[in-house]
Curated annotation (Swiss-Prot):
The gene is N. The keyword Cell membrane does not apply. It comes from the Viruses. Homomultimerizes to form the nucleocapsid. Binds to viral genomic RNA. Interacts with the phosphoprotein P. When in a monomeric RNA-free form, interacts with the phosphoprotein (via N-terminus). Interacts with protein M2-1; this interaction allows the association of nucleocapsid with the matrix protein. This is Nucleoprotein. Belongs to the paramyxoviruses nucleocapsid family. GO terms for cellular component: helical viral capsid; host cell cytoplasm; ribonucleoprotein complex; viral nucleocapsid. It comes from Human metapneumovirus (strain CAN97-83) (HMPV). It is found in: Virion; Host cytoplasm. Pfam families: Pneumo_ncap. Keywords: Capsid protein, Helical capsid protein, Host cytoplasm, Ribonucleoprotein, RNA-binding, Viral nucleoprotein, Virion.
Length: 394
């Protein structure tokens, strides 16, 4: 593997080719998917809460239910427009309700269940049944004193569910084993408050459901991105919504999901960003910022204007080709040596070779990387840069 052929000058040519396209690609022709109207948001919210509230045997549709909440939040017409804009020709089937007949709710009315296209009715019924059984048991144990925010009907349960989706969304470029392991570890930390409220929430199985869904229904990624941007632009929101936006913007802004070509950013932007992360020359950084301004928030690179170093350090541990370029900081010793581990030996070897060739041609500009003294010392030691020659690289 070699990085020598990647040059920033390729950017304008590649970007021009992409801009000149007069055509769009049609995908998912003949496929169907569920869309839930806003009028059923309360029912979807309750189903999300029931998924979190009890321990279930099967979570395979958990992610689909979370996406259906997004559908109710954006509105069915906007959802269809987002899917069309993403190039998807998938046909939508509106969610409906049906009566279970003999089963009554606590008001003595026929219990209404959701009929969601592609989701087995028996699965929905079993989720509801298990949640009600758990609720009955806990009511007896607590003499009826279950706080509202620990019940399945709590209004923020869909957002908690989607937080797991946002965590797995940042790992779509990883292998499933690495992605799930990292997601579960992070979720146990960032969702600690939610886990106290819903201790039976099965994060590993919910995360697996989201991973599988984003792989099977790629068009849902566009829907997820638009929802995250819409929620992030809202002036008010709950604590759970703020947490979701924070997780989402780390994925959208820090560039981890950009590594999945076609998800957020064009491949040419990935190459450009990676080249700057290696050479970090002021002229090239300026070119990056100019492109960011031109493309606006759609570029997903705006975080670089505020925190260039954070952007570099967040892009080093992903397993595909684009990350070889983006992860060149590991070749400087900032990631691979500074953390004392090598997550990808092939990536590290290529980055090491490239970084040393840049050192020999005096192209590494440490000052524009904004390193801490400890990081800078690690990089200089790794590249054998002496104090006498240090100025050659600054």
């Amino acid at each position: 593997m070699s990085l020598q052929g990647i040059h920033l000058s390729d950017l304008s040519y590649k970007h021009a080719i992409l801009k000149e396209s007069q055509y769009t690609i049609k995908r998912d022709v003949g496929t169907t998917t569920a869309v839930t109207p806003s009028s059923l948001q309360q029912e979807i919210t309750l189903l999300c809460g029931e998924i979190l509230y009890a321990k279930h045997a099967d979570y395979k549709y958990a992610a689909e239910i979370g996406i259906q909440y997004i559908s109710t939040a954006l509105g069915s017409e906007r959802v269809q427009q987002i899917l069309r804009n993403s190039g998807s020709e998938v046909q939508v089937v509106l969610t409906r309700t049906y009566s279970l007949g003999k089963v009554k709710n606590n008001k003595g009315e026929d219990l209404q269940m959701l009929d969601i296209h592609g989701v087995e009715k028996s699965w929905v019924e079993e989720i509801d049944k298990e949640a009600r059984k758990t609720m009955a048991t806990l009511l007896k144990e607590s003499s009826g004193n279950i706080p509202q925010n620990q019940r399945p009907s709590a209004p923020d349960t869909p957002i908690i569910l989607l937080c797991v989706g946002a965590l797995i969304f940042t790992k779509l470029a990883s292998t499933i084993e690495v992605g799930l392991e990292t997601t579960v570890r992070r979720a146990n930390r960032v969702l600690s408050d939610a886990l106290k409220r819903y201790p039976r929430m099965d994060i590993p199985k919910i995360a697996r459901s989201f991973y599988d869904l984003f792989e099977q229904k790629v068009y849902y990624r566009s829907l997820f991105i638009e929802y995250g941007k819409a929620l992030g632009s809202s002036s008010t929101g709950s604590k759970a919504e703020s947490l979701f936006v924070n997780i989402f913007m780390q994925a959208y802004g820090a560039g981890q999901t950009m590594l999945r070509w076609g998800v957020i950013a064009r491949s040419s932007n990935n190459i450009m960003l990676g080249h700057v992360s290696v050479q970090a020359e002021l002229k090239q950084v300026t070119e990056v910022y100019d492109l960011v301004r031109e493309m606006g928030p759609e570029s997903g690179l705006l975080h670089l204007r505020q925190s260039p170093k954070a952007g570099l350090l967040s892009l080093a541990n992903c397993p595909n080709f684009a990350s070889v370029v983006l992860g060149n900081a590991s070749g400087l010793g900032i990631i691979g040596m500074y953390r004392g581990r090598v997550p990808n030996t092939e990536l590290f070897s290529a980055a090491e070779s490239y970084a040393k060739s840049l050192k020999e041609s005096n192209k590494i500009n440490f000052s524009s990387l904004g390193l801490t003294d400890e990081e800078k010392e690690a990089a200089e030691h790794f590249l054998n840069v002496s104090d006498d020659s240090q100025n050659d690289y600054e």
